[in-house]
Amino acid sequence: MIGRLRGIVLEKQPPLVLLEAGGVGYEVHMPMTCFYELPETGKEAVVFTHFVVREDAQLLFGFNNKQERTLFRELIKVNGVGPKLALAILSGMSAQQFVNAVEREEPAALVKLPGIGKKTAERLVVEMKDRFKGLHGDLFTPAADLVLTSPASPAVDDAEAEAVAALVSLGYKPQEASRMVSKVAQADASSETLIREALRAAL
């Protein structure tokens, strides 16, 4: 089991990051709320990981802290919620925002996320609220504001294409993803900025 990685950020292709640790390059899937906080390419990063083994693939999911990883692990225990949907949930809102929505019993806040229908949202609220009773401490500490640390801005067309591709990988339909990015498009914006603003506008 790989639980933590410390290494150099080689590539950033939202929501994937390629992290070199001990001479090995690890492809790590990260929620966008965690991806925003990665250092620039060439710098060292530390991520807490969850390893998923499937018949057709072995996937590594990464998080900035243990609390985010704990929430991810609790999410994938819910019936009908797999790693991909859990990743989409934590990309659309921070861990603390999700906890708040569940604690306040607001399934409507979850329906706005890709792949979440009314029944799934209601099930998440019921099941996760029960699970939260056994979780205390930092998971309920207000999350810090997200900080974008990406240095250079790629060409606008490339940035928009990357943003659309990232949203599609999170569960949005191509047409919807393109529309979301177009609404927040701005000159010299990086793909990470476009993704963050598109997800924020969708809530």
Curated annotation (Swiss-Prot):
Keywords linked to the UniProt accession: Cytoplasm, DNA damage, DNA recombination, DNA repair, DNA-binding
Cellular component terms (Gene Ontology): cytoplasm; Holliday junction helicase complex; Holliday junction resolvase complex
Top-level taxon of the source organism: Bacteria
Region entry Domain I, spans: 1-64
Region of interest (Domain III), residue spans: 155-203
Biological process per Gene Ontology, one example term: DNA repair
Chain segments annotated as coiled-coil in the UniProt record: none
Gene3D superfamilies xrefs: 5' to 3' exonuclease, C-terminal subdomain, DNA helicase RuvA subunit, C-terminal domain, Nucleic acid-binding proteins
One annotated GO molecular function: ATP binding
Role, per record: The RuvA-RuvB-RuvC complex processes Holliday junction (HJ) DNA during genetic recombination and DNA repair, while the RuvA-RuvB complex plays an important role in the rescue of blocked DNA replication forks via replication fork reversal (RFR). RuvA specifically binds to HJ cruciform DNA, conferring on it an open structure. The RuvB hexamer acts as an ATP-dependent pump, pulling dsDNA into and through the RuvAB complex. HJ branch migration allows RuvC to scan DNA until it finds its consensus sequence, where it cleaves and resolves the cruciform DNA.
UniProt free text on domains: Has three domains with a flexible linker between the domains II and III and assumes an 'L' shape. Domain III is highly mobile and contacts RuvB.
Subunit comment: Homotetramer. Forms an RuvA(8)-RuvB(12)-Holliday junction (HJ) complex. HJ DNA is sandwiched between 2 RuvA tetramers; dsDNA enters through RuvA and exits via RuvB. An RuvB hexamer assembles on each DNA strand where it exits the tetramer. Each RuvB hexamer is contacted by two RuvA subunits (via domain III) on 2 adjacent RuvB subunits; this complex drives branch migration. In the full resolvosome a probable DNA-RuvA(4)-RuvB(12)-RuvC(2) complex forms which resolves the HJ.
Family affiliation: Belongs to the RuvA family.
Name under which the protein is recorded: Holliday junction branch migration complex subunit RuvA
